[in-house]
Amino acid sequence: MATTTMRMIISIILISTYVPHITLCQNITEEFYQSTCSAVSRGYLSALRTGWYTSVVTIELSKIQKNVCNGTDSKVKLIKQELERYNNAVAELQSLMQNEPTSSSRAKRGIPESIHYTRNSTKKFYGLMGKKRKRRFLGFLLGIGSAIASGVAVSKVLHLEGEVNKIKNALLSTNKAVVSLSNGVSVLTSKVLDLKNYIDKELLPKVNNHDCRISNIATVIEFQQKNNRLLEIAREFSVNAGITTPLSTYMLTNSELLSIINDMPITNDQKKLMSVCQIVRQQSYSIMSVLREVIAYVVQLPLYGVIDTPCWKLHTSPLCTTDNKEGSNICLTRTDRGWYCDNAGSVSFFPQAETCKVQSNRVFCDTMNSLTLPTDVNLCNTDIFNSKYDCKIMTSKTDISSSVITSIGAIVSCYGKTKCTASNKNRGIIKTFSNGCDYVSNKGVDTVSVGNTLYYVNKLEGKALYIKGEPIINYYNPLVFPSDEFDASIAQVNAKINQSLAFIRRSDELLHSVDVGKSTTNVVITTIIIVIVVVILMLITVGLLFYCKTRSTPIMLGKDQLSSINNLSFSK
């Protein structure tokens, strides 16, 4: 009965490099600003990713026909079982890349005999993604985004059989060689022969024996241990559809990682930092590629081009008025919270703080997620109304109570009838917060409670400084304060307030002018009426006087009239 077997040659650089341990003492200081309900945690050092370093790992599969083996020993069965597991792993990887051969062709090929495992470290970076990709693989790559574009470019090249043959041929007579790929990339390829020698000299002579006699169970165990890596690689790629992160020790062992770091075009300080920080693995990727009987995957490591510059984190919480009736308060919150790091004369701002990883007092951030700001942004902490930088805020009229856990304490925004306390696990409640924004350090405090929500404070060591000041929200008039401004600034809010005040002043002026006009008209009308009434009264008075005078005056006759009357009477 003809059977097949598999052997694996892992090409790795084993470089003995002394890497001194880096101790980062925690010297955190925290400043709480009562006026803006914010806190700044300082004392951190930067490790900002500015590029990628790409390495290539290839596993070459080939076949060999094995002599008839009729052995029934349990150890022989274990060997056969182990070979079958690897055959299934290879088939799964090929299926993942949609390059799975038919069952008949796979049966004709038989199980691959040898696996040549090489490590190739690229010496430059790439940023183009190939257009023609396998559908299943491409969909996942597009989901990752441009962060791994350089690794994808190399992965595309590895689909070309000629490129893989270049690597294979370069390693025929040497354990270390530089290969130039078709896209202009220079690849440093290295290998060692420890596993190859084991398979050739220890395993295959026993397995290929006619009766498959394996007298020592240690042979089986050692074979399982050495081949466990391929199984894990196949499992990780299968579960993650061709791209894995973080980078496991199966994808790249610690010795291999140190070897790659040693070859990176970075300073010794950067190499030391990368050698001792596990976050390097968390921020790395491995990208799979399969071509016929070659399994290849690209390992992409972060390059921290900016290190040891000061970093600080801004924490903010709602600041509301407390003197008004329930439902009529106004609130203001700084929206510029996140990580800040000095970078080449400016400040790199990372608004999504969770994208940065902290180890001790070292902050690992990706500059792809940052905004570049002027150094004047620091003025927002000490003088939010400064004229050099327009500080970012949001406004509302909803005074919701909450707490923000800082590096060495907690900010507590307590409003309305919510009960807010700080507690010690042994002494119970040690502080009750009044309405407003307050701060408590972690000295003697284990938890902070806001209503029914319990917060656990961090237990880092540091020094906290409470900077008192009048809450700036008290400077604003609730009647003209703009609400629901979610992406605003101090200048924009003040401008809207000034517009509202100007509108009110104009309304008052118009109202005043209308009142004055009405008053003048009323006076004129009243005056005219009074004059008319007076004139009428005067006319009536004169008429009455004249009439009365006429009625009361006797008739006086002259002498001539009287003489005429007398003569008339005598003549009769």
UniProtKB/Swiss-Prot annotation:
Gene from which this protein is expressed: F
Keywords from the UniProt entry: Cleavage on pair of basic residues, Coiled coil, Disulfide bond, Fusion of virus membrane with host cell membrane, Fusion of virus membrane with host membrane, Glycoprotein, Host cell membrane, Host Golgi apparatus, Host membrane, Host-virus interaction, Lipoprotein, Membrane, Palmitate, Signal, Syncytium formation induced by viral infection, Transmembrane, Transmembrane helix, Viral attachment to host cell, Viral attachment to host entry receptor, Viral envelope protein, Viral penetration into host cytoplasm, Virion, Virus entry into host cell
Effect listed in the UniProt record for changing residue 5 to A: In strain: ATCC 51908
Signal sequence interval, chain numbering: 1-25
Effect of residue 71 to S: In strain: ATCC 51908
Ranges in a coiled coil: 76-96, 156-207, 479-514
Ranges facing Extracellular side: 26-522
Annotated S-S bridges: 37-437, 69-212, 311-341, 320-331, 356-365, 380-391, 414-420
GO process annotations (BP): entry receptor-mediated virion attachment to host cell; fusion of virus membrane with host plasma membrane; symbiont entry into host cell; symbiont-mediated induction of syncytium formation
Organism per entry: Bovine respiratory syncytial virus (strain A51908)
Region Fusion peptide, annotated ranges: 137-157
Topological domain ranges for the Cytoplasmic compartment: 549-572
Site (Cleavage) location in chain: 109-110, 136-137
Effect of residue 303 to I: In strain: ATCC 51908
Lipid positions (S-palmitoyl cysteine): 548
Family per similarity comment: Belongs to the paramyxoviruses fusion glycoprotein family.
UniProt cross-references to Pfam families, sorted A to Z: Fusion_gly
Outcome (variant: residue 477 to D): In strain: ATCC 51908
GO cellular component terms given for this protein: host cell Golgi membrane; host cell plasma membrane; membrane; viral envelope; virion membrane
Name of the protein in question: Fusion glycoprotein F0
Membrane spanning stretches: 523-548
Residues with glycosylation annotation: 27, 70, 120, 498
